[in-house]
Amino acid sequence: MEKTEEPPSSNNEEDSPAKEKIWCLQRVGRDSDWLRLFEDSEVSVGRGLNVTHQILSSSCPLMISRIHCVFKLNEGRQWTVTDNKSLNGVWVNGKRIPPSTPCILHQSDSVRLGVPLDGNPVEFDYILVQKNFDDVKSFLSGNLGKDSGAASLSQKLKNSKRKFDGGDESEPCPTQHSKSKLYRSSAPDKSRAQPCPSGERRETLKLSSRPLEEDRDKAGSSSSTCSDSSQHLATLHRYNRSLMVLKGRVGDTQKRAAELEQQQTQTPEREKEMQDLQTQLEALRGQLRSQQEQALRRMETLEKSFCEEERRLETEKAQQNEVGLKKQLEEALKEHRKVIEELKHAWQGFKEVLQAKDKELEVTKEEKEKAKAQKEEVVTQMTEVLESELQCSICSELFIEAVTLNCAHSFCQHCISEWRNRKDKCPMCWQNITSQTRSLVLDNCIDRMVENLSADMRERRLVLINERKGERSKSESISSSGGNK
């Protein structure tokens, strides 16, 4: 079932020229529920109440977010669509657009809201078109067509009745007004609509509520209470279906997070992707928790109504002492107990799902901490190798501008220059120094390895390099001044 809501239209729309062209989203495969795009304002689409077009999914209530997306004309007079961080996304020409980023649309582009379920096509599939107002006014949502408005509304209500009564068109409802009326749920999410009780369940309630002729009016109130219980049960079944979809999405998200954690080297892009996945997990957990709270509130309401009905029927039984009323009470109690058991079972299922998700998230955190510890261990080992193999024996620091002597020993260029001012022999083997060569390969290797060290070690090495450059510049200036004299 789907429903669309429009803001009140002004009179100038009725006085528009017959051939005025308008932009709209054409519903694929349907001649109704097209969404008009108003050029002078933003057009929001979602299942919430404060949107331009309200759409509700019949297969999964959480398929469409409260404010799913926004359509708007940009400065270049081009239509754009922006995904408002919806759970199931917006797909333009088969590709999902990034959240909070406007995507330019062209005429005949395909716009899909949500994802397909169980191999079925996407429920909300549209095409951007520009047509004459008179040609499409009967197809627009909100009954913009003047002549066909009442007939279209009547047909929609009849279709809703057929859908929720299991195709039994001959089954009468208590009043003419309630034949095809959609009752609002008492849950906090007011955007979901509740159907009338199904034909089979209403027939059962009617048979169970036939009292004696003189007590017919009092028995009718008990049948109405059972009908309310059936509505709660139908809503709970829809919550179960949406929970299965959420559970599948949580599993996919968790699997992706585990794959990212197994990789030792994490780039900033992967870190960001991991954070996005964790954000999605928290959002899904919030939705599961919200549905659990709604189910608990429904169960409490039903238990309260059950107690009130039980007290009322007990009073009537004591006053009238009629066999028919006693039978009605027993059947009503049986129906209430059945509904309460199903609610308790569903609540237990919600609790198990939340516990499983908490456990999976804890495992993910442990794996991430383990990977971090492994990385720190690698850095520690690298530091030990640098300190033991790539240190200058004169200054006990990592080589800075390493040079290799004729005896194959390596030192810092600054250190060996200072040493040769005193002795022209190798500090390690005491051979005469006949040549020294810069080792660029060794310098590059040390520089690349220093990048993975801690910030303190990198800062300390940078200070040493600057100090030695300053000393070299000072000595060169002294030498040049002495030569001029």
Curated annotation (Swiss-Prot):
Cellular component annotations (GO), alphabetically ordered: chromosome, telomeric region; cytosol; nucleus; site of double-strand break; ubiquitin ligase complex
Query: What EC number(s) are associated with this protein in UniProt?
Result: 2.3.2.27
Start-end of Basic and acidic residues biased regions: 199-219
Query: Where in this chain does the record put each FHA domain?
Result: 43-97
Where does it live in the cell? Nucleus
* UniProt pathway annotation: Protein modification; protein ubiquitination
Could you list the residue ranges forming a coiled coil in this record? none
Q: Give the top-rank taxon of the lineage listed in the UniProt record for this protein.
A: Eukaryota
**What GO biological process terms are annotated to this protein in UniProt?**
DNA damage response; DNA repair-dependent chromatin remodeling; double-strand break repair; double-strand break repair via nonhomologous end joining; epigenetic regulation of gene expression; isotype switching; negative regulation of transcription elongation by RNA polymerase II; positive regulation of DNA repair
Q: Which HAMAP family match?
A: RNF8
Domain comment, as recorded: The FHA domain specifically recognizes and binds ATM-phosphorylated MDC1.
Q: Which family does it belong to?
A: Belongs to the RNF8 family.
* Protein name as catalogued: E3 ubiquitin-protein ligase rnf8
